[in-house]
A protein has these predicted regions:
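Short Lys/Arg-enriched alpha/beta "domain-start" segment
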Residues: 4-215
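Short secondary-structure boundary segments
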Residues: 39-66, 232-251, 371-375
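N-proximal short alpha-helices
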Residues: 72, 79, 223-226, 230, ...
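Transmembrane helix-loop junctions and nearby membrane-interface residues
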Residues: 83-85, 370-377
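Peripheral, non-transmembrane regulatory/ligand-interaction domains of membrane transport proteins
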Residues: 152-281, 285
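Membrane-associated alpha-helical segments
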Residues: 252-369, 376
Length: 378
């Protein structure tokens, strides 16, 4: 799209010479059913450290914080639009590896940041490929810690966050957004601002969070805008990463359930149902899969209980709303209920057939006893 230039108007949010910040790319990879973090002593030849966020706002006491293991590799050899790219890798017990990559920028208007959508390094590699390579190397080093490793490579759930820490002198982030609302909506949807309808602009900006006048968060489906004039955005990025991680997990569970249910229905359509062997194998698979999915669903939800900071909780709830996480969870639970019914049907059918054959065997033995008795009397 054409570059959008800032207006010469002197109002808040207009006429800025330069906005400063960084663009952050979040990737979530579902690599296993579980990662046993207690066994992880090294990631990419580096000692991992528990990732912690700074809590500056009011929070309840004694609130447990989930701390995934993390490493910070050296910056990439190739730059992104002239800026170095700094990766950060985290591993989560629920079987997810996340790759975060950050690059600084300076721009005169939000529209100039459109170039960061679908990023490609100066070497020609895409960031998607770099993130996938990081994930593959991490998984190779975590072989003994991965439980139920998934087929590789899994498709990543990527999310882009535009972080602004300097609005060229503006101190009120919310007033700035009011002036730049259409350009921000165009940036987050990767669409020319002048093409967007007013209802679409309102929808893109619908989920906003702000604690002070110096900060705000706008969350859309594919990208988000984070403004914090204090310069610290890691806490909000962490909340968005967890929501993105949950979306990846629920999406993968939903796909696996669909495939497994299709196979299970095909097995049920076979007549007659074998009494042993395949029947026992089907029951074992159904039982194991039901337990695995129930456990994963609970653990994926559990990792967000760390939000003792009320503002971060509101940011996370906004992301959960935008990503439709409740609907994804409901879809998984619905398929889990179908799996329970299927398990009951298979179990009941196998038991009925076994009881029928048991009755036939009893009748046969009774007939044999009767024949033997008659032969003896003769």
């Amino acid at each position: 799209m054409p570059v959008l230039h800032a207006s010469t108007n002197c109002g808040i949010g207009l006429g800025f010479n330069r906005m400063k910040g960084e663009v952050v790319f979040l990737y979530a990879f579902d690599v296993a059913n579980e990662i046993i973090s207690s066994r992880v002593h090294e990631i990419l030849s580096a000692k991992p450290f528990p990732f912690e966020i700074r809590m500056d706002r009011t929070l309840p006491k004694d609130m447990p914080l989930y701390k995934p293991l993390a490493i910070e590799p050296p910056p990439l050899a190739a730059s992104l639009h002239g800026a170095p790219v700094q990766p950060l890798i985290r591993i989560y017990d629920v079987g997810v590896v996340t790759v975060m990559m950050r690059a600084a920028f300076a721009a005169a208007a939000p529209g100039e940041l459109m170039r960061f959508h679908n990023p490609q390094l100066e070497s020609g590699l895409t960031l998607d490929a770099v993130a996938l390579d990081f994930c593959a190397k991490v998984c190779d080093g975590l072989k003994d810690s991965l439980v139920g490793r998934t087929e590789f490579p899994p498709p990543p759930e990527a999310y882009t966050v535009f972080c602004l820490t300097d609005l060229d002198g503006a101190k009120d982030a919310n007033a700035w957004l009011a002036e730049q609302r259409r350009d921000v909506a165009g940036l987050l949807t990767e669409t020319a601002a002048e093409k967007l309808s007013e209802p679409q602009v309102n929808e893109v900006l619908r989920i906003q969070r702000s604690f002070e006048n110096s900060d705000l968060v706008v969350i859309d489906w594919d990208a988000a805008l984070v403004v914090d004039l204090t310069g610290y955005v890691d806490d909000v990025l962490y909340a968005l990463e967890l929501a993105n991680l949950q979306l990846e997990e629920f999406r993968m569970m939903d796909q696996r359930l669909d495939k497994y249910l299709d196979r299970a229905y095909n097995d049920l359509e076979r007549r007659p149902m074998p009494l042993f062997g395949a029947a026992n194998k089907t029951l074992q698979h159904l039982r194991r899969f039901r337990v695995d999915v129930a456990k994963l669903t609970d653990e994926v939800t559990h990792i967000t209980k760390f939000f003792g900071d009320w503002y971060l909780a509101r940011v996370y709830l906004g992301a959960r709303d935008r990503f439709y996480l409740d609907q994804w969870r409901a879809s998984v639970e619905q398929r889990l209920a179908q799996l329970d019914k299927l398990y009951s049907v298979v179990h009941a059918e196998v038991n009925e057939q076994r009881m029928l054959w048991l009755e036939i065997i009893i009748v046969i033995f009774f007939a044999l006893d009767l024949m033997i008795l008659l032969c003896v009397k003769r």
